């Protein structure tokens, strides 16, 4: 930090719908570039490990497992970086699916932040796939 400020960046990597392996590679490469450029905080797209437009594929176990595997790879890659990254992925907890931002730093998962306000109009059908963050709940188990 310089004078109380940190360098932050938003990242828009090339993504492929439902191709978690490709999206994970793109995310890791962008994290490494951001850290080399001196960023201390990198914010990635919503549902970036799966792609936003997976629709009902979000309910499929193979996609959920691939996203979790991608997050594990991101965690491992972050171990040597001086960077906090927010990476988007779907997370299933107790039979409910959440649209989450994973907070990653130095090889650790610092938290999962489920989306609170889900749009349900026009091309946005998030309430079909996802549950909103439970009101007043600070921890998902």
Residue ranges and their predicted role:
Residues 1-141:
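Enzyme catalytic cores with a strong preference for nitrogen-chemistry domains
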